[in-house]
A protein has these predicted regions:
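Axial heme c-ligation environment in periplasmic c-type cytochrome domains
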Residues: 54-62, 74-104
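Sec/Tat signal peptide C-region and signal peptidase I cleavage site
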Residues: 19-23
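Soluble non-cytosolic domains of exported or imported proteins
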Residues: 29, 67, 88-92
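Bacterial N-terminal signal peptides that target proteins for export
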Residues: 1-9
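Structural motif corresponding to alpha-helix initiation and N-cap regions
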Residues: 42, 67-70
């Protein structure tokens, strides 16, 4: 019980620290260019496409995950995955790719 407060406080601080990255307007058009150059070898980046790598979900499927948010994508892009290389994107590129993925959400 006494460890819950530090853990909760730490998660809160990480969330707050991520917010400035989203405070500036992201550019989905720039994001599709970054995605084409960085992600398309494995992921389908446009709606209706099939991913070249069957383990890499298409971006429109990622966008359609219930509750998908910029912070969730930010965490995902900064966390290593077993079958995905560790990407090194600038803050601006990451923000733009996230904006592009979220632009694929059906409303």
């Amino acid at each position: 019980m006494k460890h819950q407060l530090p853990v909760g406080l730490g998660l809160f601080m990480l969330t707050v620290a991520a917010l400035p990255a989203f405070a500036q307007e992201a550019d989905a058009r720039a994001g599709v260019t970054v995605a084409q150059n960085t992600c398309s070898a494995c992921h389908a980046i446009r709606k209706g496409q099939q991913s070249a790598n069957t383990n890499a979900p298409p971006f429109d499927k990622i966008a359609s995950v219930p509750g998908m948010t910029p912070i969730a994508l930010q965490a995902s892009l900064q966390t290593s995955h077993r079958s995905m290389p560790n990407l090194i994107l600038s803050t601006e590129d990451r923000r733009n790719v996230i904006a592009y993925i979220l632009s694929l959400q059906t409303k």
